[in-house]
Amino acid sequence: MSVFAVVPVKELRGAKSRLGAVLDPVGRAGLTLHMLRRVVPALRGAGLRRVLVVSPDPAVLEEARLLGAAGLRQEGFGLNAALEEGRRRALEEGAGALLALPADLPLIEPADVAALLEVAGEGPCAVISPDDARSGTNALLLRPPGALPFSFGPGSFGVHLQAALRRGVRVRVCERPNVAFDLDSPEDLARLEASGGVQYRPRRA
């Protein structure tokens, strides 16, 4: 199975705005790149053939290339638009399956990615990995790549489940603590730092 990954990343100057109370813009940009340096190696370490990082930011695309991923300049606006652009490129390059996930998963490891692939089994399917609150979607594996529309955002776990049921797509839920934890708020950052799970020490606001 030729599995491609698509990782959307916002422009650095606007990244992680919810952390503005505790991190200055340089700190937020640095944290975003730090997490990308975790996500891409996790994907490559699990043996994915191709990793596409989609972003409007040239600095992000350059970092992606340094990590061994392909950089795709985002033309549209928003998370789901970035994922659609990545899906189109993946299909052009012959992807048999697509793994979509955000870049703000600071604990993800190759074993987590491998678990998603294992749960998929054989044949057409959708594997959904929710966030801690079981509200959002933190990873979505689709085989074939066009099996479902992308609906990432608040409440997307349920939206993706319902879309799979409506379309008759076999669906599996894969809950992994390292995938469920995404870094969005000051509380998330404090939790991560307290756990010792991040070595990066960003500049404070």
Curated annotation (Swiss-Prot):
Binding of phosphoenolpyruvate, residues: T137, G153, S156
Keyword Nucleotidyltransferase attached: yes
Catalysed reactions listed for this entry: phosphoenolpyruvate + GTP + H(+) = enolpyruvoyl-2-diphospho-5'-guanosine + diphosphate
Domain of life: Bacteria
Residue spans crossing the bilayer: none
EC number(s) stated in the UniProt entry for this protein: 2.7.7.105
Enzyme class: transferase
Pathway given in the UniProt record: Cofactor biosynthesis; coenzyme F420 biosynthesis
Keywords attached to this entry: GTP-binding, Nucleotide-binding, Nucleotidyltransferase, Transferase
Role of this protein: Guanylyltransferase that catalyzes the activation of phosphoenolpyruvate (PEP) as enolpyruvoyl-2-diphospho-5'-guanosine, via the condensation of PEP with GTP. It is involved in the biosynthesis of coenzyme F420, a hydride carrier cofactor.
HAMAP family cross-referenced by the UniProt entry: CofC (MF_02114)
Family the UniProt entry places it in: Belongs to the CofC family.
NCBIfam families: F420_cofC
PANTHER family: 2-PHOSPHO-L-LACTATE GUANYLYLTRANSFERASE
UniProt-recorded name of the protein: Phosphoenolpyruvate guanylyltransferase
Gene name of this polypeptide: fbiD
